[in-house]
């Protein structure tokens, strides 16, 4: 039989939003637990360098995540890492989170589950994922020393990944569905300094032929419908993110893209249930906005609990 625990607050997710919320909650003397089924730090761990977070001119994403985790631990934040949630029941009157070992009955909940990389929409993605299709340049870039790579996407993540991969790859081809890059101008300028990078505009990958190695990559121009073939050793994909909201879709208002809808206080349609960070429906998703969301969510959770 599973153990039952009563808590003031559970925070699901230990990225920047979740850790910030936890720091504020502990300082407010709330009996708080953070549940995280992956590495503490979230997407920031996969970021090569962070240059727009106040207090650090340049810092690696992993180092910043470590500093956030250390800060949280230093004031007593309790993180149950690699904990999987099996069931969740949310209403105005009760909030129950069930993991493999424990049933938590809580007064308030903050959802900070973040988002995951959107998969390359081709038939071969599943069988080639982790072999020649990758989503993390920091994790897998070193495998391609002196080889040819394709990077898919044109936003900040794609451009910054391409810049990072130039230290390993012989040549890099960016395949982008538009005729312009959406990345920040600073990153674009850095990219264009590298002579071994070229861009195929208005195009998408349709197929990758091969079993354990790439034989050819079929690329289609989205305007002319003309197909061409590329040769490469690996493909790194950065075509946006999908929110991790599967657990909550039956109880919380979620928009058509899967993001949780909240008011300006981070509260969802259920009283006492808040959302923060990239999982929330909003215009801008940045490290600094995630931290801001976590702050507001924790303060409003404290106010909600105090009013019960």
UniProtKB/Swiss-Prot annotation:
Keywords: Disulfide bond, FAD, Flavoprotein, NAD, NADP, Oxidoreductase, Redox-active center. It comes from the Bacteria. Its EC number is 1.8.1.-. GO terms for biological process: removal of superoxide radicals. GO terms for cellular component: cytoplasm. NCBIfam families: TRX_reduct. Belongs to the class-II pyridine nucleotide-disulfide oxidoreductase family. This is 34.2 kDa protein in rubredoxin operon. It comes from Clostridium pasteurianum.
């Amino acid at each position: 039989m599973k153990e039952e625990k009563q808590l003031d607050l559970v925070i699901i997710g230990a990225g920047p939003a979740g850790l910030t919320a936890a720091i504020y909650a502990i300082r407010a003397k709330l009996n708080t637990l953070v549940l995280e089924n992956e590495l503490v730090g979230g997407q920031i761990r996969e970021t090569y360098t962070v240059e727009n977070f106040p207090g650090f001119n340049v810092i690696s994403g992993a180092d910043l995540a470590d500093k956030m985790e250390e800060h949280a631990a230093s004031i007593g934040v309790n993180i149950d890492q690699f904990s999987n949630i099996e069931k969740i029941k949310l209403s105005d009157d009760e909030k129950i989170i069930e993991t493999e070992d424990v049933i938590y009955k809580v007064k308030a909940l903050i959802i900070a589950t973040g988002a995951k990389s959107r998969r390359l929409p081709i038939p071969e993605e599943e069988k080639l994922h982790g072999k020649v299709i990758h989503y993390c340049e920091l994790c897998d870039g070193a495998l391609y020393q002196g080889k040819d790579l394709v990077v898919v996407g044109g936003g900040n993540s794609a451009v910054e990944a391409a810049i990072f991969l130039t230290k390993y790859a012989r040549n890099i081809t960016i395949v982008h569905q538009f005729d312009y890059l959406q990345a920040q101008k600073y990153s674009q300028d850095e990219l264009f300094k590298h002579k071994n990078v070229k861009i195929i505009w208005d195009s998408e990958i349709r197929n990758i032929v091969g079993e354990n190695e790439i034989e050819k990559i079929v690329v289609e121009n989205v305007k002319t419908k003309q197909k061409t073939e590329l040769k490469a050793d690996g493909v790194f994909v950065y075509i946006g993110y999908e929110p991790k909201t599967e657990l909550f879709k039956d109880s919380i208002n979620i928009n058509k893209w899967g993001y949780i809808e909240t008011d300006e206080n981070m509260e969802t349609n259920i009283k006492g249930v808040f959302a923060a960070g990239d999982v929330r429906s909003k215009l801008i998703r940045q490290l600094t906005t995630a931290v801001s969301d976590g702050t507001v969510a924790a303060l409003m959770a404290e106010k909600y609990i105090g009013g019960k």
